[in-house]
Amino acid sequence: MTRGRCAMLAALLWGCAAPVSPCGTGPVPVDLRGSWHYEGTQSSPSTATLSGTLRITSQPGQDFYGDLSVTETDVGSGSARDLSGAVTGCALDAASVDFGALFTVEAAARRHLGTVKMDVTMDSITNGTWVESGPSGPIASGTFKSARQSGP
């Protein structure tokens, strides 16, 4: 099984549970506060691209809070819709994050599982998978990446 398929399987299995928050009051393992450029793809049920801004406004310990605003564009039809909502998550350690984005037009949160990497200029890059689950299982899924635009 490829690394990507393993990550997607993990996201699908974990997607049925609520995001891990509150996750702890320990020290901040990685400072995520700031504004992030968010890019994503949706692979099911239809193909779409997502582009926008993830803002982490508060991080008391491992928990973090903010909002996500994106434009989702259907690859087939070209139709676009704006999505925005609250973000609640957890910095599991210095290299892993788990967060949910609850868009105001959707009934279920999109759960994101990602890795955080710091490059030589200390700009954080996050990559991972997301899944939106409903009562009968996964509704939509895809991948995402974020690069910090500004921060503390």
Positions of predicted regions on the chain:
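Amphipathic hydrophobic-ligand
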Residues: 46-51, 77-84, 108-117, 138-145
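Tryptophan-anchored aromatic micro-motifs
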Residues: 27-50, 126-130
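Acidic, glycine-rich flexible loop segments
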Residues: 91-124, 129-134
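Edge beta-strand at a domain terminus
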Residues: 20-24, 54, 80-88, 125-152
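Short, solvent-exposed aromatic-acidic interface loops
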Residues: 42-44, 67-77, 103-107, 130-139
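Sec-dependent bacterial lipoprotein signal peptides
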Residues: 1-18
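N-terminal glycine/threonine-rich, aromatic-flanked beta-hairpin/loop signature
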Residues: 46-90
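N-terminal helix-cap/turn-to-beta initiation motif at the start of protein domains
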Residues: 21-37, 57-61, 122, 149-152
